[in-house]
Amino acid sequence: MKILIIGAGGHVGGAAASALDAHEVIRASRSGDHAVDVSDPESIERLFTDVGTVDAVVVAVGSVPFAPLADLGRDDYESAFRSKVLAQLDVVRLGVDRVSDRGSFTLTTGILAREPIATGAAASLANGALESYVMAAATELPRGIRINAVSPSVLEDAPSYFSAFPGFVPVSTHRVGQAYVKSVLGVQTGQVFRVD
């Protein structure tokens, strides 16, 4: 199976790449052999032109601002939406014709869609929007193409985030990687695979 992983250089994308490495994995990120800027639709188009038809696409990108609710302005919410939501939606929108019949997309959300933390309102907004999109898009994608999301908690190998997630039990990259395996190799669509 030929699998494109966008964001393979990060903790979460790296977990997906490691778990799927028995397949032909094409790693894309801001730098490297397959460079892509997911905030630029033309860059996404170039990536798909370069790699050709794929069987599955995993997207693990998106940064969001963390700040107290009173300090978040419209620009912060727009930034979160552009970086986390629109970037992943553009990959689906521009890549749907480059995914084989009965292929799949797997997007990445996060625990803040369902479990709030202080300073996390923009992240909660973006993650919730992506999860709703996955549910809706699953009913309309052509040619039997599936779409799911993986929604992990804070990762064990990202201790710099632990203080922002008090009481949250960190999850292993192995478990996160297996959620991507389930999405890519399974049969479900319109699902959010929670890892917490």
PLM-predicted stretches and their roles:
Residues 4-19:
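N-terminal Rossmann NAD(P)H-binding glycine-rich loop of SDR-like oxidoreductase domains
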Residues 6, 54-63, 107, 148:
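Rossmann-fold scaffold of SDR-type NAD(P)-dependent oxidoreductases
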Residues 28-43:
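Rossmann-fold cofactor-recognition segment
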Residues 43, 86-94:
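Conserved mid-core alpha-helix of short-chain dehydrogenase/reductase
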Residues 63-78:
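Conserved mid-core segment of classical short-chain dehydrogenase/reductases
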Residues 68, 80-81, 87-90, 102-130, ...:
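Catalytic loop of short-chain dehydrogenase/reductase
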Residues 98, 115, 136-145, 187:
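Active-site-adjacent segment of SDR/Rossmann-fold oxidoreductases
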Residues 142-145, 149-196:
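C-terminal helical subdomain
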